């Protein structure tokens, strides 16, 4: 029976269908201009860019020129790349321009679609960012699509790892900039650690189109990008605690795989306390006494390292290092590290060198970074399942773009076996069958361990020609994926490895030409061989089509339906036939964690024998319900964490905006004076209670405060003893003395030097206090959840206390800046040999898995002093060479920075 809603959808179409139909008028208008555009010369077509810019300057909006601009890009793409955007691609481009997410199936040309709104919005002259998930895709897309922009008179830049500040600044200054999400976020953080506006590389956040938007804005949504500096070495402590865990019994701890948590039982805690006591690490009687907070953190990490993290699934050991495996893609991520000491615990477990921990200097999540853009849009093949999250958090609507040709892929019901062994036996038989008929196969696994297990099983069964695509071999992944459509090819891939590269039936002729003819010079021979390769690929394509197209066989379901849909979507591109099927067992992670006992009982009642499978739509629906529960839980976690992160984000925006104002201001003297006056107000109010008699005033305390903050030795005790003295009199005398001392110092220094000194001191002190503030908020966040036991809302408590900490930061800033500036004196030092400083590191932590992704900051502007030197406190610097980089972190030589004065 058809529901009323279903009947209405059939009669009127879905809301998505109606929205898509609404673009038809503009598509027709673009098509109507096609002949006119074709008639233009190359020069006349390129001149349209200047014409559009003049129209915008005269008051036209981007919407007003959308139709002719899209028509120009379509014609340019045809001339430059030989690609003409289809009508559905024009619709995708309009969706992106209108701040929405375009869901486009694999092979529908998302990269080309982006050129339409990118060109249109770049006409505004504010820069457009196209965001990809890795350097390879950023360079590939910028190289290919940049030809269109260049033909039309626009510049294209690309940001990848390892560029200098100057190269980054040039790339951001281009009309169009291709970059990875990591590089964009790190550049933003680095910019807000610079001490001069001219050192910054980004020029604003106008419009960003995020490719694979679900991966970046959902999978890594709450991933903090972190820039940090090293802390003291604690490797001995990690190694000592690591030895305790193997001495525990299973009843000494509780493991919850669903929540990814591990806790000690009462017996386990008692055993652990005895071990710690013997090692001299326990203070007091109980592990959970306040003085043992750090030790609790270490033992919990050690327990997780041994019981929650599995080698070759969560990480591998390579060249004496722990290398993280991405949960979603199965890729190795060199440089990514687990946070909060977890990585060090794993290093201790695997007996490799323990790298030092780091202190956070600056951080931001992708959620908050991308919400800074005036205009945001995204593309992906799978977004509909996360439409609620995109709408609630980013204000982005998800619209499905129709395929250019109907999808012919057949998605079969899952086959469920009782054990993993039975499942893999059936998979081997299915691979044999498909291989014999010449059907190309993509076999999806969820981990390196399982991909290599399957590879070993295939070898034992006599298979020699197959490709394994996982984290260990990611360097070759683009080529392997591109050739996975060759008849009879067997490609084993972890999750979405190779995402961004299409699997073309018969293989990818362009990649074959690039690889096979790399040494052949242009000419008749190369043209002949290129033609032969293309003809061979066409023959192979016909064979693959005859065999049924690409067969996607998945060996397990992921927690997210979206990841499963991504895998299915590799087959059936551009109207090709295809097939997809999932092989499952009750021992799979998803089935085991989310209640396979009931299903196992049901299968036994049905009399299911060994090696037999059950195939029924009910199974698919039950699994989908389990996945929906996981997705809803993960969404709630992300949504809740965002509420907490918004508190830090609001404060971060205030601090970063204040830094820019300080760098832009011609003079900060008024700011310094205001700070000094507020400090005077605070110390007077503290020592002279309101409406109190003079004998109740704390004259000695006030004298000490004035000495501490203003570096002035004033006869305050004598002033207080004067007949009829008032509080205002005391305040005015202190203010006058402080103003005079500041004026005398400014006269000695000269206005130019004084301006530089004042600005430098404020920025350095602000940065130092902000770093401490981040640590304080982290500590507050880690314990605030316990307020719920007292019937108090943890979020409201966090907001309230975070605000108090922020107010304290501002108060400390006023006091520290005032105290330092009132002590500044000019000095001259003899030159010494320069000493190099250790670089800072950039980190990328994934809260879903606890991963910490870092890369060397890569420029001297980000050098930090050794831990014995406090950048905000010159008294800790000791002897500094004139030619050494200044310990304050400005990036200048000491003789051009703090070398002109001394605190």
Curated annotation (Swiss-Prot):
It is found in: Cell inner membrane; Cytoplasm. May bind 1 zinc ion per subunit. Its cofactor is Zn(2+). It comes from the Bacteria. It is a peripheral membrane protein. GO terms for cellular component: cell envelope Sec protein transport complex; cytosol; plasma membrane. Keywords: ATP-binding, Cell inner membrane, Cell membrane, Cytoplasm, Membrane, Metal-binding, Nucleotide-binding, Protein transport, Translocase, Translocation, Transport, Zinc. GO terms for molecular function: ATP binding; metal ion binding; protein-exporting ATPase activity. Its EC number is 7.4.2.8. InterPro entries: Helicase_ATP-bd (IPR014001), P-loop_NTPase (IPR027417), SEC_C_motif (IPR004027), SecA (IPR000185), SecA_CS (IPR020937), SecA_DEAD (IPR011115), SecA_motor_DEAD (IPR014018), SecA_preprotein_X-link_dom (IPR011130). Zn(2+) binds at residues 886, 888, 897-898. GO terms for biological process: intracellular protein transmembrane transport; protein import; protein targeting; protein transport by the Sec complex. It is an enzyme of class 7 (translocase). It catalyses: ATP + H2O + cellular proteinSide 1 = ADP + phosphate + cellular proteinSide 2. ATP binds at residues 89, 107-111, 502. Monomer and homodimer. Part of the essential Sec protein translocation apparatus which comprises SecA, SecYEG and auxiliary proteins SecDF-YajC and YidC. Belongs to the SecA family. Part of the Sec protein translocase complex. Interacts with the SecYEG preprotein conducting channel. Has a central role in coupling the hydrolysis of ATP to the transfer of proteins into and across the cell membrane, serving both as a receptor for the preprotein-SecB complex and as an ATP-driven molecular motor driving the stepwise translocation of polypeptide chains across the membrane. This is Protein translocase subunit SecA. The lineage of its organism: Bacteria, Pseudomonadati, Pseudomonadota, Alphaproteobacteria, Hyphomicrobiales.
